[in-house]
């Protein structure tokens, strides 16, 4: 009798779990779908909801806020006088902050990433906006076509920025794959479930850093920096370097014939104000807080000391590459060429 009772309880629990799984909606409809829970994505969702729209916000990671919620805050939005309106309300309202001189301006040093994420989450929850986490773009349905690969466009530096003629078909829906991040907080190579959720909407806003919805939509787009003349903007195009250090870039110091060190770009930067085809090197970084509660750091299976040679030379030459606490406790990189397929664990753009 006891065994029968135990079996019945287990069976009921299993059926309840299966029913809850089956009850999860696989199709959502909204007036506005915002893809990318970055800071701009959250603000776009809030603005649309304020206008009376039914909004769905999709964020492939576990939390909202993008770089503001998980980046190096003082670099992402360090100058307090640049934050205002609704954004200020979320990020700064009710805080006692202090300012210090940073990069020639006043940097706001307030709360950390976790608190910012909580503020973004609360702002969305207070407005009743549906948020879907841990699902990333798989396909885009445009008109009668289903697109699963980005369309290629010409960068500004290589061609004119010309939109296609005529009325292009609109996005009907996007299809999401279930792809939770791994234990280190990074995206997994292959999703656990493809075609998990479909979201239909009248308007789609791509607020992700990657721009995958845009790339699969068939809309015209470009990348890189426009020239100063393109839109008559005095600060556009190639700008002067902020930091210059005389570090030998060659595998064999002083010998150009030996080639350049890993991840050093052997290319000339154009004249000031000119266009280029470079993009920001968005990446995932590891943060060390010194608490001893983090996960162990295993030795990489493909570790190559040469990838860190530029650091060794910089340190030997007296370059202070860890001049502030953010640099001391994280691994990060800056700029990457569009053709790069792999980035180093951490890299300063030298030369």
Language-model segments: which ranges?
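Bacterial N-terminal signal peptides
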Residues: 6-16
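Conserved N-terminal/central alpha/beta ligand/cofactor-binding core
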Residues: 47, 53-54, 58-170, 201, ...
């Amino acid at each position: 009798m006891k065994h029968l009772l135990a079996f019945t309880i287990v069976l009921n629990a299993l059926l309840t779990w299966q029913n809850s799984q089956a009850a999860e909606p696989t199709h959502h409809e909204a007036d506005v779908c915002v893809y990318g829970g970055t800071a701009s994505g959250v603000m776009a969702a809030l603005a649309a909801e304020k206008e009376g729209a039914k909004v769905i916000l999709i964020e492939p990671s576990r939390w909202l806020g993008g770089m503001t919620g998980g980046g190096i805050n003082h670099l992402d939005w360090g100058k307090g006088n640049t934050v205002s309106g609704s954004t200020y309300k979320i990020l700064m309202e009710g805080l006692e902050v202090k300012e210090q001189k940073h990069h020639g301006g006043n940097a706001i040093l307030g709360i950390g990433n976790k608190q910012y994420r909580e503020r973004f989450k609360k702002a969305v929850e207070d407005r009743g906006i549906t948020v879907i986490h841990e699902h990333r773009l798989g396909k885009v349905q445009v008109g009668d076509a289903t697109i699963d690969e980005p369309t290629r466009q010409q960068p500004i530096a290589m061609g004119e920025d010309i939109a296609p003629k005529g009325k292009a078909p609109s996005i009907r829906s996007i299809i999401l794959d279930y792809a939770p991040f791994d234990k280190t907080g990074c995206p997994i190579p292959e999703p656990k479930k493809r075609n998990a959720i479909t979201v239909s909407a009248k308007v789609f806003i791509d607020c992700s850093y990657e721009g995958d919805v845009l790339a699969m939509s068939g809309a015209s787009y470009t990348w890189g920096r426009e020239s100063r003349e393109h839109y008559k903007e005095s600060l556009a195009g190639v700008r002067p370097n902020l930091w210059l250090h005389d570090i030998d870039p060659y595998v064999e110091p002083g010998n150009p014939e030996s080639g350049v060190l890993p991840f050093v770009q052997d290319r000339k930067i154009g004249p000031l104000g000119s266009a280029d085809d470079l993009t920001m090197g968005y990446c995932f970084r590891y943060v060390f807080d010194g608490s001893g509660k983090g996960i162990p750091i295993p030795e990489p299976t493909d570790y190559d000391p040469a990838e860190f040679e530029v650091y060794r030379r910089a340190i030997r030459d007296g370059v202070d590459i860890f001049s502030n606490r953010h640099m001391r406790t994280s691994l990060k990189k800056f700029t990457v060429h569009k053709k790069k397929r792999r980035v180093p664990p951490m890299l300063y753009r030298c030369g």
